[in-house]
Amino acid sequence: MGKEKVHINIVVIGHVDSGKSTTTGHLIYKCGGIDKRTIEKFEKEAQEMGKGSFKYAWVLDKLKAERERGITIDIALWKFETAKYYITIIDAPGHRDFIKNMITGTSQADCAVLVVACGTGEFEAGISKNGQTREHALLAQTLGVKQLIVACNKMDSTEPPFSEARFTEITNEVSGFIKKIGYNPKAVPFVPISGFNGDNMLEVSSNMPWFKGWAVERKEGNASGKTLLEALDSIIPPQRPTDRPLRLPLQDVYKIGGIGTVPVGRVETGIIKPGMVVTFAPQNVTTEVKSVEMHHESLPEAVPGDNVGFNVKNVSVKDIRRGSVCSDSKQDPAKEARTFHAQVIIMNHPGQISNGYTPVLDCHTAHIACKFNELKEKVDRRTGKKVEDFPKFLKSGDAGIVELIPTKPLCVESFTDYAPLGRFAVRDMRQTVAVGVIKSVEKSDGSSGKVTKSAQKAAPKKK
């Protein structure tokens, strides 16, 4: 079979009626992990319910309903295959926790597909001041999704249908606003499609003979093509950060009879392997890793993206918990954050945020209240330029630099050093009121920590 294809994660964004579900459903349906039997079952149900037109959104509705009812779905349903990649759709907005998921990084998206509806009046609604198109694109950029594809959908419902003028108008408009946010339009494929009828999705449409194809210019290499599928194949595969020091935020800590304490989490950067001496922050507990397992098989080492359980000696379940971060004691070990500075974008807060505001922050797997100790500056969210020093307050739509102080021990990192540990969501009133990216962290010196016997024993063995 040769080498396995590279795995790519994408997130599909856009206004609620842009046709995200139909477009995504179409890809999964045509290239994906849904077997014929399931599709036939869906089709039959769709017809019985009078949704006889059975288009692809139905696939997605079914999957979503099952996911929300907590039925574990075969994750293959969210995957599809292209000539070059295995692509997983990690989430599509509309899911209430979409923003939180994107930030806490259940998975980091390698590319965002922005779906815009080209129908008369529809595009304008999505892009207007309060439309979601801008907000989603801004979010993707803020959270470090560096690549973007724009799918100009519903080309079959332009006036006249499949209008080149409308496609050009929308391409120009979207180019303008993604440029302001920080994407380079020259590196973004714009593809005119119909997610419903399949035009330019997998095959070139005969309805748009005027479309000569998309072309992008990038330092990693130029690319061109005609379909959305080819645009997905032009994604630049991510460099997984194995060469960075280890950071592994814990999702859970189990006590397993006969084995002992088993922390579980996803390697974000670096590698973890048996025999390594690791430090858990913010608790500052140091111990030796006895074994590393994934899917009940022991591994010689685990790399970024792997969800692993690992066994540690002489550490009780009381010592470490969800939100703790495991790191290599010898390579820039993780430490507790005393205070940190972050750039935040206030998204939907009904009032004003001023010094002293103490909401809950969701950062990697940690969930801890932090105090907005001081609003340092207000910045223009489009240009990033400072507009005011020490503002009295920040309100919805504002961006600013703030100093935060955790109310309980917390380990975070700057976004430039360890991206997955440097993004957070601010939660209040059961919603995401702001998102942030950490600029700098003042760490505690971490002098008083617990070092287990096995760590002391393991230490001299190392060179």
Curated annotation (Swiss-Prot):
PROSITE patterns to which the protein is assigned, alphabetical: G_TR_1, G_TR_2
Region of interest called Disordered, as start-end residue ranges on this chain: 443-463
InterPro entries, alphabetized: EFTu-like_2, G_TR_CS, GTP-eEF1A_C, P-loop_NTPase, T_Tr_GTP-bd_dom, TRAFAC_GTPase_members, Transl_B-barrel_sf, Transl_elong_EF1A/Init_IF2_C
tr-type G domain boundaries: 5-242
GO biological process terms held by the UniProt record: translation; translational elongation
GO MF annotations in UniProt: GTP binding; GTPase activity; translation elongation factor activity; translation factor activity, RNA binding
A family per Pfam: GTP_EFTU
CDD domains: EF1_alpha, EF1_alpha_II, EF1_alpha_III
Residue segments, region G5: 194-196
GO cellular component: cytoplasm
Stretch list, region G4: 153-156
Record's compositionally biased regions (Polar residues): 446-455
Annotated SUPFAM superfamilies: EF-Tu/eEF-1alpha/eIF2-gamma C-terminal domain, P-loop containing nucleoside triphosphate hydrolases, Translation proteins
Region (G2): 70-74
Chief location bin: cytoplasm
Modified sites of kind 5-glutamyl glycerylphosphorylethanolamine: E301, E374
Alphabetized UniProt keyword annotations: Cytoplasm, Elongation factor, GTP-binding, Nucleotide-binding, Phosphoprotein, Protein biosynthesis
Positions contributing to GTP binding: 14-21, 91-95, 153-156
Region (G1): 14-21
Location in the cell: Cytoplasm
Region of interest (G3), residue spans: 91-94
Protein's job: This protein promotes the GTP-dependent binding of aminoacyl-tRNA to the A-site of ribosomes during protein biosynthesis.
Similarity field: Belongs to the TRAFAC class translation factor GTPase superfamily. Classic translation factor GTPase family. EF-Tu/EF-1A subfamily.
Protein name per UniProt: Elongation factor 1-alpha
Annotated source species: Caenorhabditis elegans
Gene that encodes the chain: eef-1A.1
